[in-house]
Amino acid sequence: MGFSLGAMMGLVRSYRRAQNEVSLCLARRERIQETAFSLDSFSSEDCLSLFRFLPHHIVKLVSLLHLVVPFPRSRLAVDPVECFCVVLRRLASPCRWYDMEELFGRHAPALCVIFYATLEVLMHRWDPLLSEWRVDFLRERAALYSTRIEEAGAYLDKCVGFIDGTTIFVSRPGRGFQRACYSGHKRRHAIKFQCVITPDGLIAHLFGPWEGRRHDMTLYHESGLDAVLSDALVIQGVQHYIYGDAAYLVRPWLQASFRGVMTPNEEACNETMKVPRSAVEWGFKDVKQVCASLDFPRKLKIREGPVGLFYRAGALIWNLRCCAYGSATADFFKCPPPSWEVYLGSLLGLGGQGAAAGSTSKEESGPSGAGGAGEDGDEAGGA
């Protein structure tokens, strides 16, 4: 039986295609096998660009976070420092798993397992730093916060932080979530978070994710923060408060911008609070700048990944980075953030002693402000 010329050419093309795929697989295997991850192989500048922290700070953070990641369903043996670096790199840039193979010397499936296992361990232990209002820690720093905000030109003298909602754009979800996630204000599909940011640049409280169509006041009610602040912000018999925009309803512990027809004094109050209140917007920008993958909607897909957990992890990483290198918010208010030991100890009940006096200035070896490692020139990788 003879073969036609077209059939013969098809067989030749299939053979060459298979040969090319084998060559690519062999080259990929050799490229990965030649790489062994070590922080010592990175300069300080490269480490800041890739992982957002200096090498010795990463090692110290892994120790302070007590990061031990088990892999019971696989035979992976991964150092905790490498696990943490996988999380940092994945959040720092919207890169693909394939792009990270040469950096870590591991195949994409292994990197995916390491990332999600480390993220689960990290957030299970340390997410309460964001979800709980640490009363003792924040009470001891309340005097410092209110003083720094007043010195920045604010009209209100007992304000200890600023509250606002932020919208994280996501890829268009499938059926069942499109209406819930669609924000008529932004005209995009999104999820929402509520943040309370203090003048040292830290995210003191983070609630979410929530449907993108919800109002800021709805998030405030659902967060349960109202009941907590009613007692927590009465400090030594003096009522303190946080400040938000006109979307919030006024309470003794929550002040908001005046709206409607205003007197000259009310207009002056709004004007003096306008710039300090923008500190909360700087915090939203800082999180997305340090964790650039959170600003790439094509990779944030509902039902295909824990999108809300990614943002919460980014907020925690930002807080840790702020403690070491400071932020634009801390520079504006001249309010140094606490050290890592004090910040992490506040969750363990150890941050009470010297929380206000234990504030540290920015590390001499670190960058200044939020933008020090925010721009690494990464190109947005494909999904």
Q: Can you annotate each of these PLM segments?
A:
Residues 54, 86, 100:
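Short alpha-helical segments in extracytoplasmic peptidoglycan/chitin-binding modules
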Residues 96-383:
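Short, well-ordered secondary-structure "scaffold" segments embedded in the functional core
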Residues 1-72, 124-127, 326-327, 331-336, ...:
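Charged, often Cys/His-bearing segments associated with DNA-binding zinc-finger transcription factors
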Residues 80-93:
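Short, amphipathic alpha-helical "recognition" segments used to contact nucleic acids or chromatin
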Residues 55, 80-81, 187-191:
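Short, flexible loop/turn motifs enriched in small residues
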Residues 59-77, 94-95, 291-295:
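Structural recognition of short helix-loop-helix hairpins that underlie histone-fold modules
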Residues 75-80, 108, 112:
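Alpha-helix N-cap/helix-initiation sites
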Residues 57-64, 89, 96, 114, ...:
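Amphipathic, well-ordered alpha-helical segments in soluble domains
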